[in-house]
């Protein structure tokens, strides 16, 4: 199945823009910029939206206007409106369980405690969508997670995340073509 929708998870607003939790939105924003595509607010869709076309594979890019815990609402509204199946969706998000700067592509699975993924799974009625996971590292103890994801990374960690974003963007043409196995082999190596 080809990917028709890429959603970069985030918390909206300038207070959250540079936080670790917004790493998914960083990638989707950089992808749009590299293709000279500009986001426009669509209040009905509860998102900033734009479109790109790579090698004759058109794709909608989404930055939800809802907070992370309600990302599923935006994803459901857009996927229903454009008749996009869960298997045609790529969710790009921060991942505590990957070291800073690692990136992994996977299909399906649980939410792993990520509230954005939890809501998307609930709203779509399935977890069978694709995920591009950007490693932000773990603070070491579960009680520190909330504060950690809502804080800004150090300059060193930020650069590692940006490097991971570059590697993620490099596989997007393969992802859009629907060759997930090849994309996984390239990025997960």
UniProtKB/Swiss-Prot annotation:
EC number, UniProt record: 3.1.1.29
Organism, as annotated: Legionella pneumophila subsp. pneumophila (strain Philadelphia 1 / ATCC 33152 / DSM 7513)
Entries under NCBIfam families matching the protein: pth
Enzyme class: hydrolase
InterPro entries: Pept_tRNA_hydro, Pept_tRNA_hydro_CS, Pept_tRNA_hydro_sf
Quaternary structure and partners: Monomer.
PROSITE patterns found in the cross-reference section: PEPT_TRNA_HYDROL_2
Positions bearing the site annotation: Discriminates between blocked and unblocked aminoacyl-tRNA: 11
GO MF, any single term: peptidyl-tRNA hydrolase activity
Name this polypeptide is given: Peptidyl-tRNA hydrolase
Keywords, ordered alphabetically: Cytoplasm, Hydrolase, RNA-binding, tRNA-binding
Active site: 21 (proton acceptor)
Family label: Belongs to the PTH family.
One term under GO cellular component: cytoplasm
CDD domains per UniProt: PTH (cd00462)
Principal localisation: cytoplasm
Task of the protein: Hydrolyzes ribosome-free peptidyl-tRNAs (with 1 or more amino acids incorporated), which drop off the ribosome during protein synthesis, or as a result of ribosome stalling. Catalyzes the release of premature peptidyl moieties from peptidyl-tRNA molecules trapped in stalled 50S ribosomal subunits, and thus maintains levels of free tRNAs and 50S ribosomes.
């Amino acid at each position: 199945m080809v990917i028709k929708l890429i959603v970069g998870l985030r918390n909206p607003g300038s207070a959250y823009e540079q936080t670790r939790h917004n790493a998914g939105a960083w990638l989707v924003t950089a992808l749009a910029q590299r293709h000279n595509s500009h986001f426009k607010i669509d209040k009905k869709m509860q998102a900033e939206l734009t479109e790109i076309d790579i090698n004759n594979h058109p794709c909608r890019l989404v930055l939800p206007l809802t907070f992370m815990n309600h990302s599923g609402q935006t994803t459901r509204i857009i996927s229903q409106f454009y008749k996009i199946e869960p298997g045609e969706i790529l969710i790009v998000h921060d991942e505590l369980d990957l070291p800073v700067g690692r990136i992994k592509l996977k299909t399906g699975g649980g939410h792993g405690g990520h509230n954005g993924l939890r809501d998307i799974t609930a709203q779509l009625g399935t977890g069978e969508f694709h995920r591009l996971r950007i490693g932000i590292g773990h603070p070491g103890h579960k009680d520190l997670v909330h504060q950690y994801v809502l804080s800004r990374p150090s300059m060193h960690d930020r650069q590692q995340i940006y490097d991971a974003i570059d590697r993620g963007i490099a596989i997007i043409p393969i992802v859009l073509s629907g060759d997930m196995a090849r994309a996984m082999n390239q990025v997960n190596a």
